[in-house]
C-alpha cells in the first residue's frame, strides 16, 4: 500500500477518535496500570495523554501532499494491528483505547517514523528516550522480548548502541 493512501485512511480514523474516546481510554489505561508504582503510572499517563492527542492533531492537520509517497508492506501493518489488539485487558474502555492507539501508533511507525513514546516518558530507573544526530535511543528497546510488545516496530535503537 502506498504511504499517502495509508495516511489518508489514518487521517479518516483520527476523526473517529472523540473527546469521549480519550476519556474512556484514560480510564481504561488507569485501570490496566493499577498495580504499577504510583509515581511511574502518573508520569506515564501524563505523557501518554499529552503525546497521543498531539499526534492525533498532527495527523488531522497534515495533508497527503506533504508526505513522501512510498510503499508500505501490508503484512507489516497487519502484524502491528494484531499486536496492538492483543495487548492489555479486555475491560470497559478497550474499544476507545484501541481506536486511539491504532491510529497514532501506525502513523508513528509507518508514516512519521518517530518513537512510539513521548521523549519525556520516564521508564523504570528514571531513564528516557534520547535523540542524538537524528537517531533515537530507547532504554527498554532490547528489554522488551515479549511477543506482544510492539518495540520491534519502533524506530528507536537500543540505548546501549549510543
UniProtKB/Swiss-Prot annotation:
Q: Where are the transmembrane segments?
A: none
Q: Which InterPro entries match?
A: DUF2115 (IPR019215)
Among Pfam families, the record links this protein to: DUF2115
The record's family statement is: Belongs to the UPF0305 family.
- Name of the protein this chain belongs to: UPF0305 protein MmarC5_0909
Q: Which organism is it from?
A: Methanococcus maripaludis (strain C5 / ATCC BAA-1333)
Amino acid at each position: 500500500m502506498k504511504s499517502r493512501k495509508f495516511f489518508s485512511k489514518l487521517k479518516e480514523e483520527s476523526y473517529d477518535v472523540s473527546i469521549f474516546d480519550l476519556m474512556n481510554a484514560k480510564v481504561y489505561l488507569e485501570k490496566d496500570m493499577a498495580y504499577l508504582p504510583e509515581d511511574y503510572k502518573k508520569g506515564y499517563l501524563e505523557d501518554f495523554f499529552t503525546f497521543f492527542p498531539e499526534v492525533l492533531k498532527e495527523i488531522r492537520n497534515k495533508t497527503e501532499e506533504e508526505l513522501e509517497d512510498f510503499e508500505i508492506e501490508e503484512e507489516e501493518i497487519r502484524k502491528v494491528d494484531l499486536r496492538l489488539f492483543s495487548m492489555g485487558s479486555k475491560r470497559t474502555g478497550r474499544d476507545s483505547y484501541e481506536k486511539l492507539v491504532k491510529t497514532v501508533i501506525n502513523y508513528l511507525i509507518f508514516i512519521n517514523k518517530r518513537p512510539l513514546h513521548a521523549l519525556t516518558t520516564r521508564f523504570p530507573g528514571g531513564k528516557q528516550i534520547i535523540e542524538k544526530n537524528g537517531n533515537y535511543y530507547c532504554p527498554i528497546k532490547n528489554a522488551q522480548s515479549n511477543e506482544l510488545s510492539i518495540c520491534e516496530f519502533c524506530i528507536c535503537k537500543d540505548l546501549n548502541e549510543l
